[in-house]
Amino acid sequence: MRNGKLVVAQIGCGKFAEYQDLPNITSLEKLTLKWICDLDLERAGAMQKKFGAEKITADFKEICADPEVDLIKIATSHEIHLPIVECAAAAGKHIFCEKPMAMRDEEAWRIMKAVRKHGVKLCVDLNRRMSPALQALKKSVYDHLANPKHSPWRYIETLREPLPEEEYKHMIIRIQDESSSYGLQHVDPLIGGGEIIGESVHWLDVACWFFAPAVPVEITAWGSSRLSHGINLKFSNGDDMTLTFSCSGTFDYPKELFEVTAGNAFFRSEFFVENNAYGIPGAKSEYFPMKHYDGDIREEGFNAYIAKYHERFSNFTGNSKDLETAKPFEVDKGHLNMWKAFVEAILNDKPSPCDELAGFQSTYLAQLAIRSIESRQTLPVPVERYIPAIFIR
């Protein structure tokens, strides 16, 4: 701590660090950015100049050896999370790790053991659970189930007691992405692991967070483990989530859609900017402002987002990658909220908003999904694997 602030080090300073981590760190008054670490010292120096870090290094062990550092953010490629976590935990540093926490079960178990042995907090950046839109979606669903109301024109054939299956909640997550934006590192089996490990851990985590305390009991997956795929995840109380991930879509339309049916009502969250509920009298649309937008359209919501997107490209030609770095344009997926919650957890000794168990569970389910694709079989989710017993010497 320095002057009542947590001293932070950033390890890995690629595009995500430049446009998410470092702006978030420097925006929070309870944090002080001391170190930036990257194998490319020229890149680290550029980020130091842009964000005002005090020191740079190419060796993460130098950061772990600094007694002033309280918190380390890891934004490296997936395969080197484990050695950094083990070093940081042994040095008593709290750790904010980019998703996936690990690529394989043994790596995840070792991470769990390290942070628990040394008594440090770990947060995994499975940020969708912290987005304002999905927080509101979950609240709307469970508020309705606690006090259901229905339109007077609801179709009822015969009054009767509901059948057990009619009590189940069902979630559909639709992801349409554009694979021309992927580098080969994303699908390299040693570095990125493919889109189930690299991306779909987000939506597996959303389902587990949304339906808790129910736990997954069965998983079925199909397609390609490295690109387009589908996953169905069934829970102990009968609820289920079905994910469809297509990499043959376009950035010209929003990437993520979440839908839930529950209690004879339908709930939809459209790309973190608008939520709607149907079958509930008086239900109103909820709008969520974008995190970054500097155009002229003042309205909020899904249609306004589409208009803002087209406004952004109205006078632009060339590779949109160039515009991304020059003119930020971003919905609120929960990144900053996750930072705020984790800082609060450290300062006030509260539970992490997405701890090492949640990080492991998303990785474990992703590995099961890959095995389901390879075997073309539905697989069980044994509770002894989903909630492992980690012995600390």
Task: Label every PLM stretch briefly.
Residues 51-114:
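Beta-loop-alpha module in the N-terminal Rossmann-like domain of NAD(P)-dependent dehydrogenases
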Residues 231-238, 260-262:
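Active-site beta-strand termini and strand-to-loop segments that position acidic
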Residues 127, 262-354, 379, 384, ...:
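C-terminal glycine/acidic-rich active-site capping loop/insertion
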Residues 17, 96-97, 122-124, 269:
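Hydrophobic residues in well-ordered beta-strands that form the structural core
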Residues 1-51:
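N-terminal Rossmann-like dinucleotide-binding module
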Residues 15, 128-222, 376:
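Predominantly a Rossmann-like dinucleotide-binding segment in NAD(P)-dependent oxidoreductases
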Residues 3, 120, 166-170, 371-393:
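C-terminal capping/lid region of NAD(P)-dependent oxidoreductase domains
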